[in-house]
């Protein structure tokens, strides 16, 4: 079973809004109490929250579906439905949120940072909110809107001050184990490290974090080996350290060629966090070189031979041994000085404020196009939303939808394009046979609650008929 997961695809779905209520106030000595149906509650949203106690995306590996609660339905006596609770999903510090097209949506850094991944649907209006001078007691209410559904990719980019890069078996894990309290797996074969290891290093009264990245090979920036999976973990590192195995016996390998090969991979890698005002490009990050395994005599001679050539590049060079722990203290304090100087020269990250994006109210635009089969397709945010809010089992609700489309100008546009009565018109997921209701801007004839004269339906059971049916049932029971 994997214990460290740094990339997952999750399916988020916000809660739907509650339906509105169609109710009439009933009270003694008040025969005309009027409508009192409450509005539906807002659906809950899916919110990502950075939790410093979470260090992996393992939970999403087994439970990739995240669903928030829906809002409650409105009730009579002007009682609005309860809003659905927001679902707060805890993610590690350094999580990057990408959409299904790979576009960066959020970079979650810092404890408590929040990001609304999926917005909850709005609740439907009750008949009390729909009452007007022409429609004093609506016999219908609007349905709640569905919550937003999104497929998102979460990538964990380790937050560390120093990143150790090098070829397999260079001694990176051993170095982390001796300068910090971390205990990564160490063995004498390549690719022992399969997941990044973090360690906290104490430098006098200060401390900094070190990330041990799994070994890189030529072509890592194009996906060879585990390169693309773990190169992203060094994107946030302030200092990059080349760890070189000076005791390698492989033909064609030497410290200079190893460092040049690693630099070529770092230059070819395209990080996700491009354009970050706080981070430089990887090519501009401070570098240091650790020539490891100088406890071997031949390795010490080779390290001393290339030390001056590497120093000419302007990089600090440290000759160390993780076995004898030689020169570890100069390395620790040297890295701390590089980290502090880099952070002091960079602009401080501005406090991340929650971004409020109100739902636009000026969404009156729509478009009508012929579908090539004698019908028409109406597109637009407002008509499509109205379709989802309409209860098509209620005649008055359908008539109310027709009134809204008339006022918006949809029927006028259909007539202009040559639409004939009975042709198929598609709005959203609904296709119906279009019948002109009334000229655009004209007066709409109104009828009793729950009915619409334009639909010419007379199968609705009225209050008098229900009362007569109850009387007949009582008479049969008495007999």
Curated annotation (Swiss-Prot):
One of its GO terms (cellular component) is cytoplasm. It is found in: Cytoplasm. It comes from Mycobacterium ulcerans (strain Agy99). SUPFAM superfamilies: Obg GTP-binding protein C-terminal domain, Obg GTP-binding protein N-terminal domain, P-loop containing nucleoside triphosphate hydrolases. Residues 438-479 are annotated as: Disordered. Disulfide bonds: none annotated. The gene is obg. Its cofactor is Mg(2+). InterPro entries: G_OBG, GTP-bd, GTP-bd_Obg/CgtA, GTP-bd_prot_GTP1/OBG_C_sf, GTP1-OBG_CS, GTP1_OBG_dom, GTP1_OBG_dom_sf, OBG_GTPase. Its main location: cytoplasm. This is GTPase Obg. Residues 451-467 have a biased composition (Basic and acidic residues). The keyword Lipid biosynthesis does not apply. Its EC number is 3.6.5.-.
